[in-house]
Amino acid sequence: MPALTAPEGGTPPIVDSIESFRDVIQKLQSGVGPIAIDAERASGFRYSARAYLIQIFRRGGGLHLIDPIALHGSQEIGLLNTIVRKEEVVIHASTQDLPCLRDFGIQPTLLFDTELGARIAGLERVGLAPLCELLLDISLAKEHSAVDWSIRPLHNDWLDYAALDVFVLLDLRDRVEALLLESKKLEFAKQDFAAILKASPPLPKKDPWRRTSGMHLIKGRFELAIIRQLWQIRDTVAREVDIAAGRLFSDSIIVDIARLKPQTKSDFLSLPSVRFRLKNERLKERIDFWWASIQKCYEIPQSEWPEMRARGDGLPPPRIWKERFPLAHAHLTHAKAGLLELSTQYSIPVENLITPEVARTVIFDEGRENSHAMSTDLLERVTEKLISLGARPWQIELCAPLLAHALTCDEPLPPLISEAQGSEQGPESE
């Protein structure tokens, strides 16, 4: 199996001037067929999720590496977007790249997602490198996937890696499409691709500070108040300076402060997590600021301390259904077993047949704990619920009868081995 280290014809230079950008637009306009696009962000280094490199490839239109920072706000972006909106755009794992592409000004109207398409086609390993090995018989190195793409100038070997990522996408798209046609699932994939483009941005998570790593060590509400305030201060500063929050002030430091409550600046600097991170210039240059912030945390009145457990707005966790909602629990066991069987029959992962949250919402039935008999009315109500929750027509056709049937089964199934294996991704996962 050949290992590719650079695209055929070599890696092109970075496009970082208006003149070279106009040349790119002309070349892409003369190309034919779909346009492959990829983007590199600086996750783990920067707070923002903006693109720091955009790669574009089109047959007959060339391979191009665009610097979106240098070209940000230029009128020529609109010309590029006009071309893109007229063609199918090929992206691997598009939900990761679409937000930063749209932020730059690229707004596809027709999508082919090679990662999602491969999932629906029934392939188990759907990362770009494994798919290239399986479907194209070529090997791609992935050693630069987690580097800091915000630095300038970018290293040549990084650019080779980035160019290859988009250079293989059109051939990969054709192979994935062939698999989907062969398995009669191309229409499934097309509906999912269209749904991705129509989807609204996700709502902000409630109480994101509760996801601080190490929260299992916290035993009291005062400690939670300290964590919340330091998390919020860190988030504000990280956003302003565009530095990844954990790189600015780590979760381990926040949790140590909440647990040990240093009373002096010396105590703070003596914390193991702080001593370890003092090598980090980002922390050293703000020591006085962080110590002042810590002192303010100690002044938070008890009336403002958060509850130990967040009050959820969504469904109760399935682990409590057996005791509190026994009928919903029984219905869920049947839904889960049926979805696993359907997943095997169609070679589609359960979470792509129907998302766990959607399946649980239908089955929970707003906690009514009703027994049902199979009827046209029940099937119609399940179908309407799935539509309201954003399920695609193909998902509704396959899953609505199954979920309606599950609502008629009031005796729970035993925890089968196959169900336990699928629990992480099935409708009972949290």
Q: Over which residues does each language-model region extend?
A:
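N-terminal accessory regions of nucleic-acid-interacting proteins
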Residues: 1-35, 39
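Accessory DNA-binding and partner-docking regions appended to nucleic-acid-acting proteins
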Residues: 156, 176-430
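Active-site-proximal helix-loop-helix substrate-binding element of RNase H-like nuclease domains
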Residues: 4-7, 11-14, 55, 60-170, ...
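Short glycine/proline-enriched turns and hinge-like loops at secondary-structure junctions
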Residues: 46-49
